[in-house]
């Protein structure tokens, strides 16, 4: 007889219902064609998951290194259940590609951990424009799915503050 882990522990299943979630998107404008395609695919997927257009806020920034500043400011507002970073870094002839790729990824992760807010990283790092073109549709949709799933997970794992307040009032 084979037992699954759900026979022994409580399992929080992936929840891709975006209804009532408030999602912020930060899109870089550098390599704009790729970024606009990423954003379009992402928003279309968010809508298909039940996030309403009025619950999606999009801001644009000059490039990938500026994404983290906007994410930080959006996280500080407390208005969002999840954030999405979208951009495209294409390798050139200098070390700049590695710097931008590494720093943008590290800062996005740091903001997510420090703020406790899920952030889907959709900053493409590709060698060529062709590679970026091949990835924009899938990556944009994957970021939407990831942020909805992680926002729902965060909400499910967050204690209900009202219950705690009511319980302490009854004492």
UniProtKB/Swiss-Prot annotation:
Binding site for 5-amino-6-(D-ribitylamino)uracil: 30, 64-66, 88-90, 121
Short name of one Pfam family: DMRL_synthase
SUPFAM superfamilies per record: Lumazine synthase
Enzyme Commission number(s): 2.5.1.78
Catalytic activity entry: (2S)-2-hydroxy-3-oxobutyl phosphate + 5-amino-6-(D-ribitylamino)uracil = 6,7-dimethyl-8-(1-D-ribityl)lumazine + phosphate + 2 H2O + H(+)
Keyword field contains Transferase: yes
Xref: InterPro entries: LS, LS/RS, LS/RS_sf
Top EC group: transferase
Any GO BP: riboflavin biosynthetic process
GO terms assigned for molecular function: 6,7-dimethyl-8-ribityllumazine synthase activity
Residues forming the catalytic site: 96 (proton donor)
Sequence positions that bind (2S)-2-hydroxy-3-oxobutyl phosphate: 93-94, 135
Pathway info: Cofactor biosynthesis; riboflavin biosynthesis; riboflavin from 2-hydroxy-3-oxobutyl phosphate and 5-amino-6-(D-ribitylamino)uracil: step 1/2
Keywords recorded for this protein, A-Z: Riboflavin biosynthesis, Transferase
A single GO cellular-component term on record: cytosol
Xref: NCBIfam families: lumazine-synth (TIGR00114)
HAMAP family registered for this protein in UniProt: Lumazine_synth
Function in brief: Catalyzes the formation of 6,7-dimethyl-8-ribityllumazine by condensation of 5-amino-6-(D-ribitylamino)uracil with 3,4-dihydroxy-2-butanone 4-phosphate. This is the penultimate step in the biosynthesis of riboflavin.
Family: Belongs to the DMRL synthase family.
Protein name (database record): 6,7-dimethyl-8-ribityllumazine synthase
Species per Swiss-Prot/TrEMBL record: Polynucleobacter necessarius subsp. necessarius (strain STIR1)
Record gene name: ribH
């Amino acid at each position: 007889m084979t037992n699954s882990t759900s026979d022994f522990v409580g399992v929080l299943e992936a929840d891709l219902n975006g209804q009532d979630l408030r999602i912020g998107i930060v899109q870089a404008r550098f390599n704009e064609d790729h970024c606009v395609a990423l954003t379009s695919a992402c928003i279309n997927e968010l809508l298909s998951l039940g996030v309403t257009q009025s619950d999606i806020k999009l801001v644009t920034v000059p490039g990938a290194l500026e994404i983290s500043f906007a994410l930080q400011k959006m996280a500080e507002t407390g208005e969002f259940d999840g954030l999405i970073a979208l951009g495209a870094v294409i390798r050139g002839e200098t070390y700049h590609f590695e710097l931008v790729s590494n720093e943008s990824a590290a800062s996005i992760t740091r903001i997510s951990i420090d703020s406790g807010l899920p952030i889907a990283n959709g900053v493409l790092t590709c060698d060529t424009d062709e590679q970026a073109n091949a990835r924009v549709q899938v990556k944009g949709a994957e970021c939407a799915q990831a942020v909805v799933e992680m926002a729902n997970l965060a909400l499910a794992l967050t204690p209900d503050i009202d219950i705690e307040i009511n319980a302490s009032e009854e004492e």
